[in-house]
């Protein structure tokens, strides 16, 4: 049996993601942190960045968010974000469009050039894989 954890990502526009995942890496305000099933309960502030979702089949999905909060329990993660863009698509042009939207969202929320460079690098690397 795989140790999966429930993940929900919600914005003011509604549910962006809901499912069982293997792990999640979140852009915490004090740095990135990973969550697996059985993690200690916590509430954390999130900064603009990328949520890296590792699914049960070990594939990764990325969702760019602006600031928000995460509530972590042993078997569930709930992310409340001001805005989010799913960085995936069915073809190359859709992926490029979503990637540009994700970069615009993050750029509008951050003035930290070093943090922007790291986030954009993560998005660009994910597109190539």
Curated annotation (Swiss-Prot):
- Give the protein name, as stated in the record: ATP synthase epsilon chain
Tell me where in or outside the cell this protein is found.
Cell inner membrane
User: Per its UniProt record, what InterPro entries does this chain match?
Assistant: ATP_synth_F1_dsu/esu, ATP_synth_F1_dsu/esu_N, ATPsynth_dsu/esu_N
Signal peptide range in chain numbering:
none
Q: Which NCBIfam families does the record associate with it?
A: ATP_synt_epsi
Q: Which organism is it from?
A: Campylobacter jejuni subsp. doylei (strain ATCC BAA-1458 / RM4099 / 269.97)
Q: How is this protein situated with respect to the membrane?
A: Peripheral membrane protein
Q: Which SUPFAM superfamilies has this protein been placed in?
A: Epsilon subunit of F1F0-ATP synthase N-terminal domain (SSF51344)
Q: HAMAP family from the xrefs?
A: ATP_synth_epsil_bac
Query: Which GO CC terms are listed, alphabetically?
Result: plasma membrane; proton-transporting ATP synthase complex
> Its function?
Produces ATP from ADP in the presence of a proton gradient across the membrane.
